[in-house]
Amino acid sequence: MPSAFEKVVKNVIKEVSGSRGDLIPVDSLRNSTSFRPYCLLNRKFSSSRFWKPRYSCVNLSIKDILEPSAPEPEPECFGSFKVSDVVDGNIQGRVMLSGMGEGKISGGAAVSDSSSASMNVCILRVTQKTWETMQHERHLQQPENKILQQLRSRGDDLFVVTEVLQTKEEVQITEVHSQEGSGQFTLPGALCLKGEGKGHQSRKKMVTIPAGSILAFRVAQLLIGSKWDILLVSDEKQRTFEPSSGDRKAVGQRHHGLNVLAALCSIGKQLSLLSDGIDEEELIEAADFQGLYAEVKACSSELESLEMELRQQILVNIGKILQDQPSMEALEASLGQGLCSGGQVEPLDGPAGCILECLVLDSGELVPELAAPIFYLLGALAVLSETQQQLLAKALETTVLSKQLELVKHVLEQSTPWQEQSSVSLPTVLLGDCWDEKNPTWVLLEECGLRLQVESPQVHWEPTSLIPTSALYASLFLLSSLGQKPC
């Protein structure tokens, strides 16, 4: 399931910003020290409309690219809040069976979940007046910072953190999960048999969030030309680095090239995969299972056309990079850059390099029809939690992927419309021999934020689970495609 940190952050954001939804949540406690005011970020474009772009730190602050390189002004406090988040849930059930001979079997079960957290938070913001003063007093550093030069050469856009939601003191999160079960039976006859049993299991988890941790942030785009500026009102047409006249066409092509979904639509049309009436515009706008399936199917068809030996090489090495986050990020960055620029890509080491070798020509240029689906897959895998990635790496060594795929597909199909809460019954044929918290498929779904139950197997759908569940479906679909034997 989502971490205790993630769940609390989402609830606090909902209370502080309401329905505006423009605060970007920090995804883990490890990253809660990274997104400070004035911090510079790179935005990784999403390969699908079903998951959002991701921001990553470039290890620079605004002062690192300006002169004089003095500390930035302190951000101003625009409100302090005390938020308490307490959840207490209980599910109970009982069943009794009796036969003609008066034999009886009865049983009961109860599951309870509770969590609590109380925190003092504040909003810190860099005001427009502060930005104007800094622009007047500081100019771009010369020579240009080396990291900035690399980002310029790649044509990446840069963003600066302008506002944060920060804890004022240490926060303790407590989660308790309890299960109880009991059963009785009576079997009459020459030898009357009776039995009774009870069981109880409780799990408690405590997480401490240090004072000064960043829970969420807002960004503005940084503009760099002969002078620097901050774009406080978003404009998707603007680029961070002002292109020279000879580069304007290339930059424009790069911006449009970032829409990998359009490339996948093109692949699908070439192979007549979208003959069910979904054209490109509908595919981009349709937020339903049919749209998700069309995206993923366009990718898988290209992968299935590869020779079995190449597919196995890719699959084996994906299993390795799932356990090596830096390698996975390096491969995703390399493919993204190559797909956007259309030029050669630099070789990579290790399992990421082995995958890249399968996707390039002898000249070192990417084959877009092969690179785009793998880029899409990496984007889906990146949405998943570390626990899910580890489980998928293990599943690649078994034959359970297809059943896991069918179950996730069933959940997505039966939970529409996705914008509403619902309960979805799970077919026992897809659950395996043991359906409980230790089942890998259970954990995969639970990590998406879905609540599951053992008795009368069900999934309780939450709209907030759409992004991770869609990414899980896409990951399972494409990994299964790579493992399929040719027809």
From Swiss-Prot:
Protein name, entry field: Gasdermin-D
Gene: Gsdmd
Chain coiled-coil ranges: none
Pfam family for this entry, one: Gasdermin
Annotated consequence of substituting V95D: Reduced homoolimerization, leading to reduced ability to induce pyroptosis
Domain notes from UniProt: Intramolecular interactions between N- and C-terminal domains mediate autoinhibition in the absence of cleavage by inflammatory caspases CASP1 or CASP4/CASP11. The linker helix loop inserts into the N-terminal domain. The intrinsic pyroptosis-inducing activity is carried by Gasdermin-D, N-terminal, that is released upon cleavage by inflammatory caspases.
Effect ascribed to mutating C122A: No effect on oligomerization
Tissue distribution: Highly expressed in brain endothelial cells.
Post-translational events: Cleavage at Asp-276 by CASP1 (mature and uncleaved precursor forms), CASP4/CASP11 or CASP8 relieves autoinhibition and is sufficient to initiate pyroptosis. Cleavage by CASP1 and CASP4/CASP11 is not strictly dependent on the consensus cleavage site on GSDMD but depends on an exosite interface on CASP1 that recognizes and binds the Gasdermin-D, C-terminal (GSDMD-CT) part. Cleavage by CASP8 takes place following inactivation of MAP3K7/TAK1 by Yersinia toxin YopJ.
S-(2-succinyl)cysteine modification, residue list: C39, C57, C77, C122, C192, C265, C299, C434, C487
Modified residues (Phosphotyrosine): Y38
Effect of loss of the gene: Knockout mice are born at the expected Mendelian rate and do not exhibit any overt phenotype in normal housing conditions. The gastrointestinal tract develops normally. They are however resistant to LPS-induced lethal septic shock. Primary bone marrow-derived macrophages fail to undergo pyroptosis in response to canonical (acting via CASP1), as well as to non-canonical (acting via CASP4) inflammasome activators. CASP1-mediated IL1B release is also impaired, but not CASP1 autoprocessing, nor IL1B maturation. Reduced ability to protect against acute S.typhimurium infection in the gut.
GO terms, molecular function: cardiolipin binding; phosphatidic acid binding; phosphatidylinositol-4,5-bisphosphate binding; phosphatidylinositol-4-phosphate binding; phosphatidylserine binding; wide pore channel activity
Outcome when changing C77A: No effect on oligomerization
